Amino acid sequence: MLAIISPAKTLDYQSAVPKFEISQPQLTQYSQQLIDICKQLSPAQIASLMSISDKLAGLNAARFADWQADHNEQNARPAIYAFKGDVYTGLDVESLTSDDVLFAQQHLRMLSGLYGLLKPLDLMQPYRLEMGTKLANKKGKDLYAFWGNVITQTLQQALDEQGDNILVNLASDEYYKAVQASQLKARIIKPVFLDNKGGKYKVISFYAKKARGLMCRYIIQNRLTEAEQLKEFNLAGYWFDEAASTKDEFVFKRDLGE
């Protein structure tokens, strides 16, 4: 079983990181091409392209300028310890054991606008480049055109290496769109998390993101290998609704109350 999640805009490069045998990102030759484009952009152009403040644009212009093809423990940190955000709050990597993290290294991947696909212990330098960014490049008008089938092929390789064909899509639509799902030799399971607020079950973004992280945590801690095992997920009050689910879309519901 291989799970995929989105990255996060919020990054942490300050806190301590446990000692692991780190890995190198696989697609840095592509990352370098994107960095070369981004280095040509002024802070004002970055602000416009990414719809961010001038202050954030200045920070990210500096990050692009500082980015190096050589990733080491002085200029980078393992991706799973760098990303912070709702999904990663649910995952809560700081409380996972070393064995859990090593399991995740085989069974979890993070999609990325700059790096394409990351393993948890892949070194990553600070950046901001969301997959939906309309960054013109030699292959087209945006990052979907740039990555083409590269992410899909790398994902297939990861699926093959971990031993089965089950892919659990816990990524946002923006990032999953970079995966050419029809090209994968995989059974793709999509968990959906609905919260009952005011008498109606619906996707509430903040809760759904955190739940996707919780599902990752559940897969990792319980060493799941079968799709059916996902249905037993019950963290944070969620329960599997068989009637609302389909063969490959697993619906989990939770009652928040009024």
Curated annotation (Swiss-Prot):
* NCBIfam families per the UniProt record, alphabetical: PRK02101.1-1, PRK02101.1-3
Question: Which protein are we looking at?
Answer: UPF0246 protein MS0374
Which InterPro entries does the record cross-reference, listed alphabetically? Answer: YaaA (IPR005583)
Identify its protein family. Answer: Belongs to the UPF0246 family.
Any one cellular component term from GO for this entry?
Answer: cytosol
Do you know which PANTHER family this protein is assigned to? PEROXIDE STRESS RESISTANCE PROTEIN YAAA, PEROXIDE STRESS RESPONSE PROTEIN YAAA
One Gene Ontology biological process: response to hydroperoxide
